[in-house]
Regions:
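An N-terminal-biased, well-structured beta-alpha scaffold segment characteristic
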Residues: 1, 5-101, 105
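Glycine/serine-rich phosphate-binding loop and adjoining beta1-alpha1 elements at the start
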Residues: 2, 76-164
Length: 167
């Protein structure tokens, strides 16, 4: 089986569907991974790291692959050959046109954002992990924007009261 990892095209998207570590694990299972050149740049993974993990890099991750894994659905569904599978956050309940075009192109799609948030599916639950990271980042951004110390600080020279916030 060949898995393709495309470069994300959505504006501001910095995530990548597979890390070099996950790529290495797939390779040990006999799965060949093709990573589009620059796909990991936004997440600070170089092409060399993917190659060291056993992946090959190419100008496109859509050519001659059985499965495409992406964070979001590719903009150009026509890049996917009939019989290819796509695993991404497709938002099928919102983007009916995308679902229709995937079906018309003969692409089997797995919408990762519709996997139930239950214990049995926890290892595939992308929404909980992304929400957790987004919440953490929001607190960091808020702390930076506040311009005052978050924790209470006690020193010989005095005490700085903790910041108060609402999440």
């Amino acid at each position: 089986m060949r898995v393709g990892v495309p470069k994300e095209t959505a504006e501001g998207e910095r995530r990548v569907a597979l890390t070099p570590n996950a790529t290495s694990r797939l390779g040990r299972g006999g799965i060949e991974v093709v990573v589009e050149s620059g796909a990991g740049d936004g997440s600070f993974f170089s092409d060399a790291e993917y190659q060291e993990a056993g992946a090959s890099t190419a100008p496109s991750a859509f050519e001659s692959v059985d499965l495409v894994v992406a964070v979001r659905k590719p903009d150009i569904v026509t890049s996917l050959a009939a019989g290819t599978a796509l695993a991404a956050m497709i938002q099928p309940l919102v983007d009916h046109a995308a679902v229709r075009s995937l079906a018309e192109a003969g692409v089997t799609s797995f919408s990762m954002d519709t996997i139930p948030r239950i214990a049995r599916a926890q290892s595939m639950d992308v929404l909980s992990s992304m929400a957790s990271l987004a919440g953490y980042k929001a607190a960091i951004i808020a702390a930076d924007a506040l311009g005052k110390l978050f924790p209470m600080m006690m020193a010989a020279s005095g005490t700085t009261p903790p910041a108060k916030g609402l999440v």
